[in-house]
Amino acid sequence: MIIEICATTINSIINANRAGANRIELCSNYSVGGLTPSIEYVKEALSISEIPINVLIRPRPGNFVYNDNEIDKMKKDIISIMDLGVNGFVVGSIKSNGEIDDEFINDVRALTNPLDLTFHRAFDYLSSQTRSIDKLIKSGFSRILCSGNENDAIEGITNLISLNRYSNNKIVIMPGGGVNKENCLEFKNAGFKEIHLSGILKNNSPIILDSDYNTIKEVVYKTK
């Protein structure tokens, strides 16, 4: 099973590599669900990581309906990062009517080809998810990160299983949101090939935003 770690700190990247994770989603501002990281952070991450890094492109907190200036900002951020050696990008945009932003996903695919592309948890807010899966497959996206329309993926696992069945191995459905060492095996047993988690210990006070080495290692071991 592929284990993707959401990393917002250098220690998280180090721990993900040491613990045997397969890929990193690099972002900043974990507390608001992740935003586009700085160029400096991307460069430092690439210099120390031996596993692939996909960079989140999200210009602000809040919803995923973006105006023209925000769309342009995301494209410019992609252009400034794509030649640094990243594996791919994590993106998403929704139209005001709840449909997937076809123009944006097609533009990003053309801009980044042949880099790896993930459509992020904006997917959970789409009005027609099966139609969106078809469009993402056609656009050449590799995977969809989602939680099955619930806050936690374990709560949405029934919906996730339905989406996974519909995708028919043409695109990866990657559960994310509340995935942890206690429930990770449920996703493997349900037939998912990849999972996404932060590995942050939520019971720490104050919360330390480093992905925990032992947590990642246990998830890797359980899902072999």
Mark where each language-model region is:
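Active-site mouth loops of central-metabolism enzymes
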Residues: 1-9, 57-75, 118-128, 173-174
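Hydrophobic faces of well-ordered beta-strands that scaffold small-molecule active sites
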Residues: 3-7, 24-26, 53-57, 89-91, ...
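Active-site beta->alpha loop and helix N-cap motifs at the rims of alpha/beta catalytic domains
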Residues: 10-12, 35, 42-48, 52-102
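Catalytic cores of alpha/beta
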Residues: 11-18, 65-77, 124-139, 163-167, ...
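Glycine-enriched alpha-helix->loop->beta-strand junction motifs that scaffold or abut catalytic
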Residues: 19-24, 49-52, 85-88, 111-115, ...
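Glycine-rich phosphate-binding active-site loops on the catalytic face of alpha/beta enzymes
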Residues: 24-35, 80, 84-96, 141-154, ...
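Alpha-helix-loop-beta-strand connector modules within alpha/beta enzyme cores
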Residues: 34-61, 100-122, 155-180, 211-224
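Hydrophobic, well-structured mid-protein blocks that either form specific transmembrane helices
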Residues: 82-132
